[in-house]
């Protein structure tokens, strides 16, 4: 663990002895991959085919609007989002959020992120000083940085269950980091 998700990811990543092409996965602790292991590995390897792949994830958007909210409803209506995630509501019922088909995207949600060790080293995992919250907006920061470096972020086909809805109620740090991201 650490004092922030940035510190935790950086500390744990640095403990690994990875070759540049090894793939490292960062994910929430409340997800479950429902694909068979062989299907998951096949889809992950397929997503990394091609040159300059940055991050691969389960959900994201082709366009991050001025609000910096990747799941923006207006952009969703325009077909800008990608991915499919099963969630569990407060009553324990499973429902599916279908953002759109797998495609290349600008940014990805941090629910599930995969990247080669080389990409992770290029992007870096340290928290920038201008992000004040310790646990929020790392996903948009990392994946937008990869995009700005000329890498291609992708949503892959993955059957994934998220045991929460990603609730923001009472999470001022998410709103503060979002505003800091917009300002920088």
Which residues fall in each region the model found?
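Short, high-confidence coil segments that cap the C-terminus of an alpha-helix
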Residues: 21, 51-53, 151
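Alpha-helical elements of Rossmann-like donor-binding domains used by nucleotide-donor carbohydrate transfer enzymes
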Residues: 7, 11, 39-46, 141-145, ...
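Short beta-strand-to-loop acidic/aromatic patch adjacent to the donor-nucleotide binding site
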Residues: 21-34
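C-terminal catalytic/acceptor-binding lobe
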Residues: 128-184
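Active-site nucleotide-sugar/metal-binding loop of Leloir-type enzymes
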Residues: 10-23
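Conserved catalytic core of nucleotide-sugar-dependent glycosyltransferases
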Residues: 37, 42-127
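A short, glycine-/small-residue-rich helix N-cap motif at loop->alpha-helix starts
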Residues: 2-13, 135-136
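Short catalytic/ligand-binding loop motif for oxyanion handling, primarily in non-cytosolic enzymes
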Residues: 33-35, 63-69, 162-169
């Amino acid at each position: 663990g650490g004092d922030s998700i940035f510190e935790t990811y950086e500390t744990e990543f640095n403990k690994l002895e990875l070759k540049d092409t090894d793939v490292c996965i960062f994910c929430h602790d409340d997800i479950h991959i429902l694909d068979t292991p062989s299907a998951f590995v096949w889809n992950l390897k397929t997503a990394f085919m091609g040159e300059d792949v940055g991050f691969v994830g389960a959900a994201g958007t082709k366009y991050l609007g001025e609000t910096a909210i990747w799941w923006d409803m207006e952009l969703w209506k325009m077909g800008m989002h990608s991915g499919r995630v099963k969630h569990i509501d407060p009553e324990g019922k499973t429902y599916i959020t279908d953002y759109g088909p797998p495609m290349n995207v600008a940014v990805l949600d941090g629910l599930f992120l995969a990247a080669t060790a080389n990409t992770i080293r290029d992007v870096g995992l340290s928290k920038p000083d201008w992000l004040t919250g310790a646990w929020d907006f790392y996903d948009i920061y990392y994946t937008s940085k990869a995009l700005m470096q000329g890498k291609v972020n992708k949503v892959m086909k993955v059957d994934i269950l998220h045991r929460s809805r990603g609730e923001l109620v009472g999470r001022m740090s998410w709103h503060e980091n979002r505003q800091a991201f917009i300002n920088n």
